[in-house]
């Protein structure tokens, strides 16, 4: 459905995207995750044909975005972070205008609007001015215009930003329903949003694609956490010794709050993400005479992976 190959984009001296590549298959729900300023919105604008990359190619359903922008846009439903709503129009009037702009045949517009209204739960609000609706329902109107023309691809940029918890839950339920008929790319900086809605995550940091993984794969992996019962240690020697254990790929000081603990703490990543390194690490600690305080497996989460990538970028 989407193929992005070696895309680069700069704004003057600022490199927003560097050699970004990824693919999304039809029917997937994929999260584009990154901190503010990571390049997510730039990526989306390039995908939707509203911004040209400096280099690279982008195709949607086999059609080149740069060469056939209009044709690609006809296949995309797009909800930007700030939905382009006219507050003085009624919901029905706004959707009617959008149907006309989408070149939906006049004799079919009523049916298209009815389907979008039903899908987004707006039937009781058709005659109300958009400006009188709550932010949650205004977001529903934005989603209704995005799906009005029955797109094969739905691109959502921060769809729950600024909503209260109840509205967030409602919009997420709506997105799940919409994903049954469209491929969905969801851009967000909220980790829980990706965990709640997506099957797969792309992590973009400082304009670079740092990770591409199924959430189920992340949930099935773990690291070994080693804590030594000593106030001072030869950290470099410990790291070197741990790195020589068979099956170890990376050794680092533990991230987050553990760095502030009095006891030296190490995070050990296996080359085989599902391997249990604890027995081999225990043997090393015993043979080296290390004062072992704690040794355990620590399940990797989206948060731990994201924080690890963010701090090493």
Predicted feature residues:
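Conserved ABC ATPase signature
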Residues: 88, 129-136
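ABC transporter nucleotide-binding domain
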Residues: 170-270
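Conserved ABC ATPase "signature" region
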Residues: 96, 100, 107-125
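Conserved ABC transporter NBD signature motif
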Residues: 56-67, 71-72
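C-terminal coupling/interaction segments
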Residues: 269-313
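Catalytic Walker B motif of ABC-type/P-loop ATPase nucleotide-binding domains
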Residues: 154-158
